[in-house]
């Protein structure tokens, strides 16, 4: 079945590609396996030089690849350029730090002696071929945050990207090739979802990482579990954004707009549930709704556009279904809640939306809203805020706005999430681990924790 790239701003099919045949997939697996045998022996210096070159090339390509991303999945071109810059920065960070992150670890002399050894240490060795199943919403960043540490660790990668961003997927393969990495180090597999199982079950593939939906994560985890292969999953999120009385409410409301509307609202780490103390609720709600109304919806190729189209027609339909269900169940739409009139017949647009009077029996309370839709809650104290924040199947990240040290400590202690961001919005950075709990997945990306996920952590014990 052909793989098509469609412009979500107008529904135009830009390009189509033939999916790889079984023979072509086998060729890529053979190439990856052969490459790993030699690439795993390269030095950190050699790998860092290649990754630095890739970063330089990406910087030079920034405008071009930004336009590709925008036409493939609809993010504003300004945000696409920022994504490319972030990827280059992450490449340079891992090129600089990988050697220290994977340095041999030496137990204390006392522990070595107690074990009966003359010497002992822990070594981080590459695993082999890692399959990366990646989503469309950050088509460069999601891949680079896997590829940069994996390649620096001495692994090789196979990318099965989302089927609506094949141009970006092929660009990434070409980027690493132009940087000087051996051809089998990083390969894009233009395949449909049904072909993933065969690749993952292949004995040459030793591990998999997936960023995407819960159903996709369940499928990959099930197959990998059957084959006893390591996996890292980063799935959905419905992050709480809690505002307490000592917060700078004006700043919190301004950041809330960015946190909800970034990437057209299609971000797993976007704040989605806004939980506000009653003492500052009215002030926050007024500022937040005003900010959401002021967002410029339009052509994502225009420099002044804040919110472009959703990535697919089905994605918009799913979002509309959640909003309509909430309204039917008694929720109040404070702004938005419909397709913008100017784009009613062109593209997959949806107005920035704020909904209040949410109850816990509504679907919108339990499910992830993947688009520019915010739910607004009023609470009476911190206990109620934490309880409501944790009332979700997801546990990716969280935000709290307060200048009370005791509240910060309490929130960080009791929130069920992989991240806590105080007086700021959630954002990933190569120095800090990223990942979630509950149905948001398991394992970590980025930082020392991320690069070690796909390493064979080896104990070397030497006796007399």
Kindly label every feature range from the protein language model:
Residues 1-118, 311:
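N-terminal Rossmann-like NAD(P)+-binding subdomain of aldehyde/semialdehyde dehydrogenases
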Residues 14, 215-359, 422:
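ALDH superfamily catalytic-core signature
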Residues 11, 32, 47, 69, ...:
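Residue-level signal for inorganic ion chemistry
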Residues 13-20, 35-41, 131-132, 241-243, ...:
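Short, well-ordered beta-strand elements within core beta-sheets of diverse protein domains
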Residues 108-251, 379:
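Rossmann-like NAD(P) dinucleotide-binding subdomain of oxidoreductase/dehydrogenase enzymes
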Residues 156-158, 333, 419:
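A short hydrophobic/small-residue beta-strand
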Residues 36, 40, 55-62, 66, ...:
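Structural signal for hydrophobic packing residues in well-ordered secondary-structure cores
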Residues 10-16, 205, 242, 296, ...:
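Conserved C-terminal structural/oligomerization subdomain of aldehyde/semialdehyde dehydrogenase
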């Amino acid at each position: 079945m052909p793989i098509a790239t469609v412009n979500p701003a107008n529904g135009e099919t830009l390009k189509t590609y033939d999916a790889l045949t079984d023979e072509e997939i086998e060729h890529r697996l053979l190439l990856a396996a052969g490459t790993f045998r030699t690439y795993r022996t390269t030095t950190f210096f050699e790998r860092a030089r290649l990754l630095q070159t890739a970063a330089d090339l990406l910087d030079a390509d920034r405008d071009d690849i930004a336009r590709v991303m925008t036409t493939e999945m609809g993010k504003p071109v300004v945000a696409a350029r920022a994504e490319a810059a972030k990827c280059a920065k992450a490449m340079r960070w891992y090129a600089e730090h990988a050697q220290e992150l994977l340095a041999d670890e030496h137990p204390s002399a006392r522990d070595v002696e107690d074990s009966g050894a003359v010497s002992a240490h822990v070594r981080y060795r590459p695993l082999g071929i890692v399959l990366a199943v990646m989503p469309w919403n950050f088509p460069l960043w999601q891949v680079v945050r896997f590829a940069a540490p994996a390649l620096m660790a001495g692994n090789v990668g196979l990318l099965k990207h989302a089927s609506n961003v094949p141009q970006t997927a092929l660009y990434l393969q070409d980027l690493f090739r132009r940087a000087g990495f051996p051809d089998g180090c990083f390969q894009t597999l233009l395949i449909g979802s049904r072909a993933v199982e065969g690749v993952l079950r292949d004995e040459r593939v030793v591990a998999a990482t997936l960023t995407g939906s819960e159903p996709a994560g369940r499928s990959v985890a099930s197959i990998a579990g059957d084959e006893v292969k390591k996996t890292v999953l980063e799935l959905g999120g419905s992050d709480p954004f809690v505002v307490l009385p000592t917060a700078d409410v004006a700043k919190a409301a301004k950041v809330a707009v960015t946190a909800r509307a970034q990437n057209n609202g299609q971000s797993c780490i976007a704040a989605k549930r806004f939980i506000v103390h009653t003492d500052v609720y009215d002030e926050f709600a007024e500022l937040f709704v005003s900010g959401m109304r002021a967002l410029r919806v339009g052509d994502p190729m225009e420099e002044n556009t804040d919110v472009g189209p959703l990535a697919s027609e089905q994605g918009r339909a799913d979002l509309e279904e959640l909003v309509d269900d909430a309204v039917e169940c008694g929720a109040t739409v404070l702004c938005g809640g419909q397709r913008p009139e100017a784009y009613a017949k062109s593209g997959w647009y949806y107005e920035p939306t704020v909904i209040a009077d949410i109850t816990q029996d509504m679907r919108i309370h339990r499910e992830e809203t993947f688009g520019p839709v915010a739910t607004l809650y009023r609470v009476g104290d911190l206990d109620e805020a934490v309880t409501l924040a944790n009332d979700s199947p997801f546990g990716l990240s969280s935000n709290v706005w307060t200048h009370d040290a005791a509240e910060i400590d309490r929130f960080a202690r009791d929130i069920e999430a992989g991240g806590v961001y105080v007086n700021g919005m959630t954002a990933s950075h190569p120095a800090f681990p990223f990942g979630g709990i509950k149905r948001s997945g398991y394992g970590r990306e980025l930082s020392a924790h991320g690069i070690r996920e796909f390493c064979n952590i080896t104990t070397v014990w030497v006796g007399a």
